[in-house]
């Protein structure tokens, strides 16, 4: 028999197959069990020894001060809407200088962060600096035509050299963090600020 299942969501899946034929005289081989675990690639890097990596990441509604979690963290609960075609400020704090940063958005949801999904190619924080606290802000543009909907966004750092093209590659010093972004065509009216605006209310026929 043929049976297809959707294993696209992260987690562990239990697989069980069982046969119960009347003419089966060997019941010892009737049951097959296995498990499949689907996780995003989690690169290894040292972000604790010298405070490399990210101590703060801010983008739109995401404001995440964090420590080192073995070089990789998936903040699946942190999500923000981003409008296709718009440019956003990204603020990052690191604990060591010479940190190169790249950002990808997995538009096709295949868990492979390819070069054409890169939205920040190479930004260096605190060039030539050593240990300390460095905060810098740079810009990220969501390209026109990007696939709408919810996707994983990966930000990755590497000390003293450009982040590898392979977003799953381990590095000696740095950190990788994954977030969730929701790409939309425009924000609702409630998302627009009306600071310093003058509102005039008209009454028509006492209604």
Feature-to-residue mapping (PLM):
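Intrinsically disordered, low-complexity Pro/Gly/Ser/Thr-rich segments with frequent PxxP/GP/PP motifs
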Residues: 1-9
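Enriched for extracellular/lumenal, surface-exposed ectodomains of secreted and cell-surface proteins
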Residues: 7, 14-28, 156-165
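Short tyrosine-centred short linear motifs in exposed loops/low-complexity segments
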Residues: 9-13, 146-149
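Extracytoplasmic/periplasmic beta-strand context in beta-sandwich domains
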Residues: 15, 30, 34, 153, ...
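Short, exposed coil/turn segments at beta-strand boundaries within extracellular/luminal domains
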Residues: 23-32, 170-175
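Ser/Thr- and Asn-enriched, surface-exposed coil loops between beta-strands
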Residues: 30-31, 132-134, 205-207
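A broad "non-catalytic interaction surface" signal
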Residues: 39-187
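Surface-exposed, proline-anchored Ser/Thr-rich loop/turn motifs
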Residues: 80-83, 187-207
């Amino acid at each position: 028999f043929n049976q297809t299942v959707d294993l696209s969501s992260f987690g562990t899946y239990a697989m069980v197959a069982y046969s119960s034929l009347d003419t089966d005289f060997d019941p010892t081989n009737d049951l097959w069990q296995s498990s499949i675990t689907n996780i995003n690639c989690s690169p290894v890097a040292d972000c604790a020894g010298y405070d490399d990596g990210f101590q703060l990441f801010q983008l739109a509604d995401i404001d995440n001060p964090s420590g080192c979690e073995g070089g990789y963290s998936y903040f699946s609960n942190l999500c923000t809407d981003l409008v296709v075609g718009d440019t956003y400020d990204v603020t990052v704090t690191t604990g060591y200088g010479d940190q190169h940063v790249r950002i990808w958005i997995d538009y096709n949801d295949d868990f492979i962060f390819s070069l054409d999904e890169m939205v920040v190619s190479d930004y260096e924080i605190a060039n030539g600096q050593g240990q300390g606290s460095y905060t810098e802000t740079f810009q990220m543009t969501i390209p026109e035509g990007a696939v709408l909907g919810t996707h994983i966004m990966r930000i990755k750092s590497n000390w003293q050299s450009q982040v590898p093209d392979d977003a799953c590659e381990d590095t000696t010093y740095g950190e990788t963090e994954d977030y969730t972004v929701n790409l939309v065509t425009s924000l609702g009216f409630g998302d627009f600020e009306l600071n310093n605006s003058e509102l005039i209310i008209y009454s028509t026929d006492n209604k």
